[in-house]
Amino acid sequence: MPPSLHVTFLCHAATHAMKTARFPTGDEPPAYDNRAALAQRFAHFDGRVIASPAPVARATAAWIASSVETSDAFSDIDYGRWRGHAIRAIADKDPEGMSAWLTNVDARPHGGESIAMLSERIANALATLVHDDARTGRYLIVTHAIVVKAALAHVRGDPLESIFAMDFAPLSSITLDYDRQRGVWTVA
């Protein structure tokens, strides 16, 4: 097992839902083809590429590597009955629910997953990676911005509420390193 682990989280490409301020449906393709930029950016990546099962994440990952694994652990948060709906329409129809969603990590006004539930799932996924015996110890996880936020809050030990103040653009990335000897995560 390598002495350290390097996990790069990459936010998937933009989707039409993102461009039109809608909650995702989970089956959106990328709105633009960004393969040239990503191929150059990750040309020398030599680890495992793991994507959320969402088509946009799988397509983004396929622009980088010919061999891509998928993992439900890195799926988008479950937006429940809000899937596919315009954010403004939900805010108008259910202002209390939207307010709770934007301020309370345990809120699930849509009937799906709360931020706290997502964060627990991501913490478990990171623990699984820590115990993986991959030869390179390098991972590229292509996923959703909310998943990246949850991972960052977890490794930094930040309160989950910090997720509300984070913003990750499509195709932005962050690398998290884990020192197996010290048992410590750091933001690279």
Model-derived features with residue positions:
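Short glycine/proline- and acidic residue-enriched helix-loop micro-motifs
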Residues: 97-117
